[in-house]
């Protein structure tokens, strides 16, 4: 009995009845879940629809052009398939041997290249990065005790930022652009935000640096090394880490065209951080990669990667969450993925015009890969994973048993913000809009985000919890350096004071109200021909309306140039930089005419509210809006 005074007659205790009822409901819920799993499995088997037919129908329902896929069965057999269109413009059909681009799934292959070098003793995973790339200057406050090591780059615990706009959206990158050019972006680009090794934070920059490591160790372009020393030994003869496109002087006719919503085509373009997301492959070749990942590290009968390193492919090591007992997280190449009551080891991928997913299930010796030639924001890609998992007939895992929570769980209640932010330049947006409220009701932990549906977590013992749509422990509460942290192994949140959040929210609310006042009252005065040039709102209103000027130029500009210095981006920087100055001018005019009437006071308050928000945005690096530096 967790609360109240212990009664002499237990059967008369309302608290006792509450606990018994709670336990009964919990067991009933778990029993229903188990029955539901069996029913779903039986229904799926009874449905009898072909995988190709189901995927084809799903592609149409989701508005996707086409897909290729492969499966590896427990007996080692490989099957491949395709559905939809390889090119929506030409109506060319997708074939099982059509090539696709897989985005960040390329990181798996690059990681294997690094592990191959480690197996050959050409580098060690614990080698500090500074020993290999001394000219690459990191801003690491923990350099003396915790330098960034090779393993930190592999498992995304280096503390480096993910990606900048100009690294991801630029037309200036060429197929042979030196990898170091991706890090020529100022002193704050390579700032380490957390103690290396302590916390997962996905970093495309980290894998860009790993490409440089491979080139330094091998003395050749990383693409050439990986093609010869990783893809060839694995039998991936139709794959390459080199740049491949559908257009230009040397188009690859087998490469599917990339698409966005409504069948808009997009040809492949070079990128700065190509080691993090450049791989052209086929479904058959990805099945061969999956077979290797399911094995003991041998390729063509010979040792390729040591078994010890193979065991670390998806096992998080040394992070705060793993030390607190959470098995979910990312290893040296893959992440643990718990979906639909099946736990696998996976890596997703996204690049312009393409999406992909690679999942292996070592216990069942099974795997699947699926690649899409459409990158659609609102499509449900998870439904395809469900279809492939169902077709593989993977056994369903019962939910982890309920366990007694730690007695101090209630002390973790409060408001949490992402730590670190997925993108350092977006930290203000993540703090204001990406926060999560943690609430404990005595039986379950609730995560209540500002955006999205609340999530209920069931305690499974101590500070470990399981989300209702997971089978294994999915979250952990922990304390580090006096900070309260919530983690699911791939995302970390730190508790912040309510006062800080109230200040941020209040600043935003007051600023928006102030800007709306300038817009509405200013336009009303202008409509009544009562807005002379010396009016307090004249300059602020003009500057506010000027924010519309860059929009048509952005509309006619390719989104792949968002990170470039273009007329549209320069104009956006100018008009956003002028806004706080214009508001300050209006406020100064109010000051000069103070005491002459109530209008001055009425205008001054919203102008002051607007100015404080603009200064806050400038402090966080969002004003002026320089897309080429974000």
Residue ranges and their predicted role:
Residues 38-44:
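N-terminal signal peptide c-region/cleavage motif recognized by signal peptidases
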Residues 82-88, 141-362, 388:
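Short, surface-exposed loop or secondary-structure junction motifs
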Residues 379-630:
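Peripheral terminal and inter-domain segments
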Residues 17-32:
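Bacterial N-terminal signal peptides that target proteins for export
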Residues 52, 69, 75, 99-126, ...:
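Active-site SXXK
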Residues 79-81, 357-361, 365-374, 484-488:
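Short, well-ordered beta-strand elements
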Residues 48-100, 119-124, 135-143, 174-175, ...:
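Short, conserved catalytic-motif segment at the N-terminal edge
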């Amino acid at each position: 009995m967790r609360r109240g005074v212990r009664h002499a007659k237990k059967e008369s205790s309302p608290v006792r009845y509450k606990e018994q009822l709670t336990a009964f409901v919990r067991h009933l819920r778990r029993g229903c879940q188990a029955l539901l799993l069996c029913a779903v499995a039986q229904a799926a088997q009874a449905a009898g629809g072909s995988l190709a037919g189901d995927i084809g129908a799903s592609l149409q329902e989701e508005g996707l052009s086409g897909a290729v896929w492969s499966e590896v069965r427990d007996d080692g057999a490989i099957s491949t398939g395709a559905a939809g269109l390889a090119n929506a413009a030409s109506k060319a059909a997708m074939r099982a041997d059509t090539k696709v681009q897989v985005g960040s799934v390329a990181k798996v292959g690059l990681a294997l290249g690094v592990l191959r070098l480690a197996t050959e003793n050409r580098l060690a995973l614990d080698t500090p990065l500074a020993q290999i790339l001394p000219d690459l200057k990191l801003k690491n406050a923990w350099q003396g005790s915790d330098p960034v090591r090779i393993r930190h780059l592999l498992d995304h615990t280096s503390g480096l930022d993910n990606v900048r706009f100009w690294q991801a959206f630029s037309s200036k990158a060429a197929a042979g652009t030196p990898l170091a050019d991706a890090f020529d972006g100022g002193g704050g680009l390579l700032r380490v935000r957390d103690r290396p090794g302590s916390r997962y934070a996905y970093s495309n920059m980290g894998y860009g640096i790993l490409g440089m490591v491979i080139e330094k160790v091998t003395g050749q372009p990383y693409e050439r090394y990986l093609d010869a020393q990783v893809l060839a030994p694995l039998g991936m003869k139709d794959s390459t880490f080199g740049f491949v496109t559908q257009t230009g002087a040397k188009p690859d006719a087998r490469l599917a065209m990339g698409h966005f919503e409504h069948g808009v085509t997009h040809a492949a373009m070079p990128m700065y951080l190509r080691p993090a997301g450049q791989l052209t492959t086929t479904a058959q070749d990805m099945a061969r990669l999956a077979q290797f990942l399911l094995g003991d590290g041998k390729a063509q009968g010979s040792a390729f990667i040591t078994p010890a390193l193979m065991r670390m492919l998806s096992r998080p090591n040394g992070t705060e969450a793993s030390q607190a007992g959470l098995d979910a997280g990312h290893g040296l190449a893959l992440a643990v993925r718990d979906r639909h009551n099946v736990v696998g080891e996976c890596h997703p991928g996204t690049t312009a015009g393409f999406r992909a997913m690679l999942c292996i299930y070592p216990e069942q010796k099974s795997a699947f890969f699926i690649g899409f030639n459409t990158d659609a924001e609102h499509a449900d890609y998870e439904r395809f994973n469900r279809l492939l998992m169902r077709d593989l007939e993977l056994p369903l895992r019962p939910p982890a048993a309920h366990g007694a929570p730690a007695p101090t769980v209630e002390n973790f209640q409060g408001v949490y913000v992402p730590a670190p932010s997925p993108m350092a330049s977006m930290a203000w947006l993540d703090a204001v809009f990406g926060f999560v409220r943690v609430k404990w009701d005595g039986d379950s932990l609730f995560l209540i985000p500002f955006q999205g549906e609340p999530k209920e977590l069931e305690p499974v013992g101590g500070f470990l919890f399981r989300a209702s749509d997971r089978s294994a422990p999915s979250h952990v509460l922990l304390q580090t350096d006096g900070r309260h942290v919530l983690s699911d192994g791939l995302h970390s949140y730190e508790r912040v004071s309510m006062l800080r959040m109230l200040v941020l929210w209040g600043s935003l609310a007051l600023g928006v109200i102030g800007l709306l006042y300038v817009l509405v009252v200013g336009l009303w005065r202008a409509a009544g021909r009562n807005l002379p040039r010396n009016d307090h709102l004249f300059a602020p209103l003009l500057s506010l309306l000027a924010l519309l000027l860059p929009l048509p130029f952005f509309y006619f500009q390719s989104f792949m140039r968002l990170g470039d210095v273009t007329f549209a981006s320069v104009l956006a920087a100018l008009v956003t930089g002028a806004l706080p100055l214009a508001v300050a001018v209006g406020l100064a005019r109010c000051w000069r005419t103070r005491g002459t009437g109530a209008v001055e006071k009425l205008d001054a308050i919203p102008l002051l509210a607007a100015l404080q928000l603009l200064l806050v945005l400038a402090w966080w690096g969002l004003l002026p809006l320089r897309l080429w530096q974000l």
